[in-house]
Each structure stands twice: as C-alpha cells, then as structure tokens.
Amino acid sequence: MITIKKGLDLPIAGAPSQVINDGKSITKVALLGEEYVGMRPTMHVRVGDEVKKAQVLFEDKKNPGVKFTSPVSGKVIEVNRGAKRVLQSVVIEVAGDEQVTFDKFEASQLAGLDREVIKTQLVESGLWTALRTRPFSKVPAIESTTKAIFVTAMDTNPLAAKPELIINEQAEAFVAGLDVLSALTEEKVYVCKSGTSLPRSSQSNVEEHVFDGPHPAGLAGTHMHFLYPVNANNVAWSINYQDVIAFGQLFLTGELFTDRVVSLAGPVVNNPRLVRTIMGASLDELTDSEMMPGEVRVISGSVLTGTHATGPHAYLGRYHLQVSVLREGRDKELFGWATPGKNKFSVTRSFLGHLFKGQLFNMTTTTNGSDRAMVPIGNYERVVPLDMEPTLLLRDLCAGDTDSAQALGALELDEEDLALCTFVCPGKYEYGQLLRDCLNTIEKEG
C-alpha cells in the first residue's frame, strides 16, 4: 500500500447516496470537441444526417486514423463551432437503435488476441479515444506503444461515486477489459485502487496497487509518480474504470457500450445519488427538476476540475464520471474576511469553521476575493503529495518559464493534478490553464 499524507478531501455538502438509480430519459447527446487536446476534426457528417450508434462522426487531422464515433443512433441536429471555427460540439437527437457491430470473442480468447486486432477494433469503434497519454494528456497515436497502462479504479474527487459498486456490477466486462489492455501494452497494466476488493485479471502483467489517503490519492498522475514516473522518453497511458468496462463489453458482445454511471451531487441537489445515463448525455435533461430554486452552476465533472455545462457545452464530458451542481456565489459580504466564519471553510484555519470536525460546507462558485499576487505561504506544499517543489513550479508556470517548469516535473502533470493548488491559492490563479499553456509550448518547441 502507498499512503498519501498530503492532500485535501474537500468538506463539501451534498455527497451522493451510493446506490445506482436509473436516470432520466435522454433525447440529446453530444461529443465535445474541446475535450481532446490538440484535436482538429475532419467531419464525416453534417446537420440533418442520420447516424447509427458507433458510426464515425469525425476524425483527427493531427492524429491520423483516430476516429470519434456516435454514442447513440439518431440524427445530427447541431454542429457547434467557436472562435476560429474550433469544434465545440456535435449534437445528436436520439432515435432508433441501429448500430455498427464488431467482432466478438470468448473471454478466454481476449488475452491471446493479436495487438493489431485489438487496436483495429478499438479505433473503429471509437473507444481508442478512452486512452490518454502522459505527458500531454492526448489520445495516443495509433502506431504508438507504451510500457505502462494505468487503470484508475478509485476516485477521491469530491462527491464522487465509489468505483467498486459500478465495477462489481460489471465484473465480467471489467476483467475482460483488463485482459484486452494486457495484450495492448508491451509490459504492465497497473490497476490502482483503494483497499476494497475488485475482480482480478489472471494475466501476469496486470498488477494491483493500493493507494490510501486524501485527494489526489486517486488521480492517475499520483499513481504514475510513485509507480512509473513519466517524462519525454517514458510515456504512460491512462484509462478510467468505466472505459475498461466498455472495452470488455465491446469485445464480449461486439457492440459499443456507452452506458455511464455518474454521481449527480452537490449542495443544491435535492436528492444526491448515482444515476445511470449515457455518454455525452444532455445535462439540461439529466438535471431537470433535480436542483433547489435559485441561480446554480451545473458542472460536468468534479467541482475542482470540471467544465461549466452551458450552451453548446451542456453535455456530459467524455472523461467525466460526475455531474456537480453549485450555487452561483453572487452575494457580496461586507468585511467577510473579518467575521468569525463559523460556516466558512479555510485551509489556513483563518475561520472558526475548522474547529467543528466533520462539518460540511455549502460551498458556492465564489472565489472569496479578487485576483492578486501569488503568495507562497505553504498552502501548495500541504496539498501536493508528489516529490517536487510546487511553489517553484507554479511560479515558473506563471512566468511562462517552460525550461525550468519542465525541469521541475511539469511533464508529469495534467490540469487535474494542480486543481487543489488552484483551490488553495490566495492569488486566485488558474494553474491548470497555465500548465496547459506550458505543455503546449513544450510540445510545439520540443
């Protein structure tokens, strides 16, 4: 067991009941283009086209051969683009049950499949996009290989579901997915989990590792740091546990599996719980009548790293297993910093709230202050468990010093790894975006 001592479990109210419920009927789904780092689409469909489930919607010009497929059967009703014609979303109205089918195999055959057979089926089905590289967090090139694949079978994000509930419900498919991954990599598959019991693969190159401690103990970046540190030459891939289940279902049934179990939770959700829905589901429909009155913000993903689900982005993200809802923090509080703060949370124990152990807070979207200088008071060191100098790294990200940032470990990181630094920062810096700008520069300039 690897125990993480530094970090922070956010004491936010509205945790979900850990029972899986059926979600609302969904009539619209979407693929969100901006989720895929560096992707430039070649469109295969236009508004008005009828599509089958698993039919190709677009391919990536920059990553030749990588295909993005429809999670449902229906009709393309919107292709939304932003500034410089960046693809925002392809929206599909759900209709019918036609689908593209693929080869299916017996469970005993999976570990012995040729890598090319596995790769071809994953690419054609669109499930290849479930894999992401580290560094850079991009969909891997089709011809690339890796010596390490990390399966994130735990989740320490605030308000998250317990993965073991979902995995044990789909035990056969999860093991089948691990067998597929074991044949896909040159060396090891690392299944990173909490202390709970999970279905196990019998393949010798599939290893289980237990992590314990506060968030970010459940992030792929943390697991890689301790088990297989990445750099420009050591590239690892990561995948979440629900996509492993989808891999298994694809090879066992020959059909694209797009079910998702997500946590619908937050301080303003009437009945926080786990709901079964589909990949890319409309969050306007999924959250309809689920929230308390007032102005709220629906977030696809965690409250720390998720995206504001509004307009053309109001759909469940490809890599998101949560839907979080917070009240918009519009109210101004005169001299709020000078009040005792019984109902306020503070990492630095500036308010009385820290005296009440176990207290949960109705957190909002407010940043509790305006932008200001980066102040190194030890906050970052409290929440970063990795063997690096977070204050120096964050300073370099602010200054745009990519050489120094790379030397300090920036290539190991993804936006989610710095989310707690953003949360505890007195200067209100968005370190995730600064990291992405740095990584883009490093990749472009070599």
From Swiss-Prot:
E.C. designation(s): 7.2.1.1
Keywords carried by this UniProt record: Ion transport, NAD, Sodium, Sodium transport, Translocase, Transport, Ubiquinone
Assembly information from the UniProt record: Composed of six subunits; NqrA, NqrB, NqrC, NqrD, NqrE and NqrF.
Catalytic class of the enzyme: translocase
PANTHER family in UniProt: NA(+)-TRANSLOCATING NADH-QUINONE REDUCTASE SUBUNIT A
Domain of life: Bacteria
HAMAP family associated with the record: NqrA
Catalytic reaction list: a ubiquinone + n Na(+)(in) + NADH + H(+) = a ubiquinol + n Na(+)(out) + NAD(+)
Family of this protein: Belongs to the NqrA family.
Protein name: Na(+)-translocating NADH-quinone reductase subunit A
Functional note: NQR complex catalyzes the reduction of ubiquinone-1 to ubiquinol by two successive reactions, coupled with the transport of Na(+) ions from the cytoplasm to the periplasm. NqrA to NqrE are probably involved in the second step, the conversion of ubisemiquinone to ubiquinol.
Record lineage: Bacteria, Pseudomonadati, Pseudomonadota, Gammaproteobacteria, Vibrionales
An example Gene Ontology biological process: sodium ion transport
GO molecular function terms noted in the UniProt entry: oxidoreductase activity, acting on NAD(P)H, quinone or similar compound as acceptor
Pfam families in UniProt: NQRA_2nd, NQRA_N, NQRA_SLBB
